[in-house]
């Protein structure tokens, strides 16, 4: 994997062509340029380009200002629409929120627990210790585990708390919770 330096305007343009959460900059550029690795051999751009000039690291495309757009794209995605169970939609939303801002997600989940239950933990065992019937599942693409034997209303409440903590607009929170 190589890194390249791009200005903010170009980065925003590339980011605006994101089709799904977690899509890499390489995937976006390949699609935009209609380029596939199998169709053309890699050729150096110039012999004068030196590795020391390559400064910026390639980032996953999810800038803070596009987090609302990213959540809306999740709701419109085929992957989300194909989920028949509320628990699967719940896990997809959690994965997306984590990918947008893992620090804010961590802060939100630390303050989220019931009177007698812990909802999120770093390992399955912690959740099982707080209730034998919790049915913990790992949130895909994250280090978090979440209990899943709660009713849909509780799952919505958990997502609402996290999204409010991450400062999403109220109408988007309502829309997301309505789809779970």
UniProtKB/Swiss-Prot annotation:
> This protein is called what?
Negative modulator of initiation of replication
Q: What does this protein do?
A: Negative regulator of replication initiation, which contributes to regulation of DNA replication and ensures that replication initiation occurs exactly once per chromosome per cell cycle. Binds to pairs of hemimethylated GATC sequences in the oriC region, thus preventing assembly of replication proteins and re-initiation at newly replicated origins. Repression is relieved when the region becomes fully methylated.
Q: Which family does it belong to?
A: Belongs to the SeqA family.
Q: Name one GO cellular component term.
A: cytoplasm
- Asked whether the UniProt record includes Transcription regulation among its keywords, one would answer no
Kindly state a single biological-process term from the GO annotations of this entry.
regulation of DNA-templated transcription
Where is this chain's protein located in or outside the cell? Cytoplasm
Annotated stretches, region: Interaction with DNA:
86-87, 115-119, 149-155
Supply the NCBIfam families for this chain.
PRK11187.1
Q: How does this polypeptide assemble, per the annotation?
A: Homodimer. Polymerizes to form helical filaments.
Q: Which coarse location class describes where this protein primarily resides?
A: cytoplasm
GO-annotated molecular function: sequence-specific DNA binding
Question: What SUPFAM superfamilies does the record tag this protein with?
Answer: Replication modulator SeqA, C-terminal DNA-binding domain, Ribbon-helix-helix
Give the domain of life. Answer: Bacteria
| Pfam families, alphabetized | SeqA, SeqA_N
User: Which keywords does this Swiss-Prot/TrEMBL entry list?
Assistant: Cytoplasm, DNA replication inhibitor, DNA-binding
Which species is this record about? Enterobacter sp. (strain 638)
Q: Which HAMAP family match?
A: SeqA
């Amino acid at each position: 994997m190589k890194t390249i330096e791009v200005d903010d305007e170009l980065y925003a343009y590339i980011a605006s062509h994101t089709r799904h959460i977690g899509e890499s900059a390489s995937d976006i550029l390949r699609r935009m340029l209609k380029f596939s690795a199998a169709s053309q051999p890699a050729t150096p751009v110039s012999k004068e380009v030196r590795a020391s000039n390559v400064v910026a690291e390639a980032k996953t495309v999810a800038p803070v200002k596009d987090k609302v757009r990213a959540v809306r794209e999740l709701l419109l995605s085929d992957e989300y629409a194909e989920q028949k169970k509320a628990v699967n939609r719940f896990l997809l939303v959690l994965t997306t929120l984590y990918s947008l801002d893992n620090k804010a997600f961590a802060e939100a989940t630390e303050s989220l627990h019931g009177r007698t239950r812990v909802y999120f933990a770093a390992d399955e065992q912690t959740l099982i210790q707080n209730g034998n019937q919790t049915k913990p599942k790992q949130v895909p693409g994250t280090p978090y585990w979440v209990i899943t034997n709660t009713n849909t209303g509780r799952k919505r409440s958990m997502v609402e708390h996290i999204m409010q903590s991450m400062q999403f607009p109220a109408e988007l929170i309502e829309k997301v919770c309505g789809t779970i």
